A protein has these predicted regions:
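Accessory RNA-recognition modules of RNA-modification enzymes
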Residues: 11-254
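N-terminal amphipathic/basic-hydrophobic helices that include classical n-h-c signal peptides
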Residues: 1-15
């Protein structure tokens, strides 16, 4: 009987799997980095990245093999978990901001508490630490008082836009003001509306977008190192007890 370097029999080792191989598994737990955990029929542990949820049965593609586990990216959800909810944001799954909008809010709180427990146990070395339940937020949308967006001359295209001729696209390719997609530091999604920001902040962003785009103001390029516009910061402050008497104050930094 042959063994790998970790002492695991080859017939039951993650090293028998290959990058690019498709696997199917039911997810039973959560882990760090917004990953879910599943086990294959041979007992191999797999961490699945993407908008998955505990209780999902998924098809995923392996992209990393370790001595004790596999890491895979979500490709298809075969059976949906009852812990899911419909994401409110139309950019969810593309935008690198929100990670858990596909989870019911009570499930989000459970996952956050578990992350604290895991950190205390596995990193801190505490045995059976006591961690109270998470205190729910009063508002889960429209609560942010600051958003920081990037200008880019390379707009991120959705899968649907990839099949549309450039002349028929509703937005130009060389302008975007928004957030980066995961793994795309040089491209940004042109965000029309962020559900975490207030309506006033979204209006401010849209005003700046139209002003800069219509006047064709130059955007800084990370490739040529030329251009002017790089970032937009919108901050909203409300004085305690003066919401009716005084309007909110804004700060825009370009």
């Amino acid at each position: 009987k042959s063994f790998d370097r970790a002492g695991v029999p080859w017939f039951n080792s993650p090293l028998m799997y290959k990058k690019g191989q498709m696997i199917e598994t039911e997810l039973f737990d959560t882990a760090d980095k917004n990953r879910c955990v599943g086990k294959l029929e041979d007992g191999i542990c797999v961490f699945v990245e993407g908008t998955a949820a505990v209780g999902d049965t998924v098809r995923a593609e392996i992209y990393k093999t370790k001595k004790r586990y596999l890491v895979a990216s979500l490709k298809e959800i075969l059976k949906f978990s009852d812990r899911r909810t419909a994401p409110r944001c139309k950019y969810f799954g593309l935008c690198g901001g929100c990670k858990w909008q596909h989870l019911d809010y009570s499930e989000q709180l459970r996952v956050k508490r578990k992350q604290v427990l895991d950190a205390l146990e596995h990193l801190g070395g505490f045995e059976t630490p006591e961690v109270a339940d998470c205190i729910p937020a009063e508002e889960i949308f429209g609560y942010r008082n600051k958003i920081d967006m990037d200008f880019t001359d390379r707009r991120y295209l959705t899968a649907d836009e990839m099949n549309i001729p450039e002349a028929e696209l509703s937005k130009p390719l060389d302008f975007a003001l928004g957030f980066h997609a995961p793994g795309c530091p040089f491209k940004a999604i042109d965000i029309d509306h962020c559900d975490l920001a207030s309506e006033e902040m979204n209006l401010a962003v849209e005003t700046v977008r139209r002003f800069c785009r219509d006047r064709k103001l130059s955007i800084y390029s990370t490739f040529t190192h030329e251009g002017f516009l790089r970032n937009l910061v919108v901050r909203r402050g409300e004085r305690t007890g003066e919401l009716i008497q005084a309007p909110p104050e804004f700060m825009l930094v370009i």
